[in-house]
Design a protein with these regions (language model features):
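SAM-dependent transferase fold signal centered on methyltransferase-like domains
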Residues: 1-500
């Protein structure tokens, strides 16, 4: 089936740098052209140039409506997810099942880390677009399945579908005729960090080649468009699927909104999925489980436990929360769910990665606080450290402070100081010029000559706009003012410039 007719395709190529609003208003001028389709495609390509450059560089890609393009993963975040699943292994391995295929951006990147891949999507039209785009992108190891992943009967039948379609000797997955050979993957600077991002065991056995990784990106809005705050409220209900998924899934990867409480999500997954002390008698008999491991326990629990949490930011803006859970079934018959690795937390902002143990990240320990004298007694050689958005979301400030030997400015400021420059700190670094109380005379002296300033507030009783009005400064310039509450409860302004 032809998705775009020749006239419309030619129109798209000839106008893809034009203003789509003007094209839409002049639709009557273009006879024989599906202008609505053309506008969607032109707008999609223009967005892809910024967000998905490898897609924009590929002729023949069909794009969804603008809102879907804005909501889909970027090439940066999709590439990071591929690195997480690929680990340090050599070449493609195992089977990927993406149960929430959508536009197929994540799938198109993830699938290249696997020998075989299955895209599942309940929208028939999206399946048609995905099948076409995968062919254009040269993805030749993928099968497209039109199904609803919230249907428990479908999930329970997935092992049979995989067996029927993909375990035919070494043929790989069935693909459409005319599929091109896979294109070489683009290099990414983030590959330099791969050794620090994940620890994945390597195996050259046939069993490893057939291990299943399930990817889920549950919808985070209800039918009224309201944002959900718990994974229990997302669709499909991940927790409800865990027992069925544990029958055949080795690794589960959840892509969630960074607005969700990751602490609660980890607790819910572990509570629903992990049996720490496994009794063989409590296992489903092997006849009732898949061939390469045990299924859920008799009480209906699965055997998943969270192995890593990844908070992914791009240019200091949190984009995604990734939770990776491992199936304990391979060790369950031998005494429990112990892993050969310690569950980890990764805070990622472009090329900067800060990691710690997940146990440490979930603790709430106090941070040592510094004393910041104001006025003439204020320190002028100290550096101010502002954690990036990924670390802020993780909330592991005590780990950060201990690792980099920095002190907090206040108990809830999430600003840190040290008397030295620190290489690799996950965030921004400023040189403190002065520290001022809110005393009018002291403010006048500390801000003498400052007409422009960038202002941020942390645990401070005034808004940025109200403070700017009081200080009588306009936005911009090379001065950065951080208004906060320090250890003794007083309100201060930390006046800084970017460290060089």
């Amino acid at each position: 089936m032809e998705l775009i007719d020749d006239n419309t395709r030619k129109f798209i190529l000839g106008h893809r740098n034009d203003d789509v609003r003007r094209l839409a208003l002049a639709a009557d001028k273009y006879s024989g052209v599906d202008v609505r389709m053309a506008v969607d495609q032109i707008q999609g390509w223009q967005t892809a140039r910024r967000k998905l450059p490898s897609w924009a560089a590929t002729d023949g890609i069909v794009y969804p409506p603008h809102l879907n393009m804005e909501q889909c993963s970027s090439e940066t975040t999709a590439t990071y997810k591929r690195m997480v699943v690929a680990g340090s292994g050599n070449g493609p391995r195992g089977i990927l099942v993406d149960l929430t295929g959508g536009f197929g951006v994540d799938f198109s990147f993830l699938s290249r880390a696997f020998r075989k891949a299955v895209y599942v999507e309940r929208s028939e039209s999206l399946c048609t677009i995905a099948r076409h785009n995968f062919r254009m992108l040269g993805i030749d190891n993928a099968a497209v399945v039109n199904a609803d992943s919230s249907d428990m009967a479908f999930i329970e039948g997935l092992p049979r579908i995989i067996e029927e379609q993909f375990h035919s000797a070494e043929r790989g997955l069935p693909v459409e005729e005319g599929t091109e050979n896979s294109k070489a993957e683009a290099d990414s600077g983030m590959q330099n960090h791969i050794g620090r991002l994940v620890k994945v065991s390597e195996s050259a056995t046939a069993k490893a080649d057939n291990e299943v990784t399930v990817f889920l990106d549950p919808a985070r809005r209800d039918s009224y468009g309201r944002k959900m705050v718990s994974i229990r409220d997302c669709e499909p209900d991940v927790l409800a699927l865990l027992p069925a998924l544990s029958r055949f899934t080795s690794t589960l990867i959840l892509k969630l909104s960074p607005m969700l409480d990751w602490h609660e999500a980890v607790r819910e997954i572990n509570a629903a999925g992990c049996v720490v002390a496994v009794d063989k008698a409590n296992m489903v008999p092997e006849d009732d489980a898949n061939a390469d491991g045990v299924g859920p326990t008799k009480d209906g629990k699965s055997l998943f436990t969270v192995s890593s949490v990844h908070i992914v930011a791009v240019r200091n803006e949190c984009k995604e929360l990734l939770i990776v859970a491992k199936n304990c079934r391979q060790k369950a018959l031998y005494g429990g769910c112990e892993h050969d690795y310690e569950p980890k937390m990764y805070c990622v902002d472009d090329g900067n990665v800060f990691s710690c143990s997940l146990k440490e990240a979930m603790e709430h320990s106090a941070v040592a606080l510094a004393t910041l004298p104001t006025g003439d007694g204020g320190a002028v050689t100290t550096y101010l450290y502002v954690p990036n958005s990924a670390v802020m979301k993780a909330g592991c400030f005590h780990v950060l402070a201990s690792h980099y030997a920095v002190d907090g400015v206040g108990p809830n400021s999430h600003l840190f100081v040290a008397g030295r420059m620190i290489d690799g700190f996950p965030g921004r670094v400023f040189r403190i010029v002065a520290v001022s109380s809110m005393n009018k005379r002291e403010l006048k002296r500390s801000l003498a000559g400052v007409k422009h300033a960038n202002i941020a507030t942390r645990n401070f009783p005034m808004s940025v706009e109200a403070l700017r009005k009081r200080l009588k400064v306009t936005d911009g310039g090379d001065v950065y003012i951080f208004a906060t509450t320090v250890a003794d409860g007083s309100h201060v302004l930390i006046i800084t410039k970017k460290a060089t």
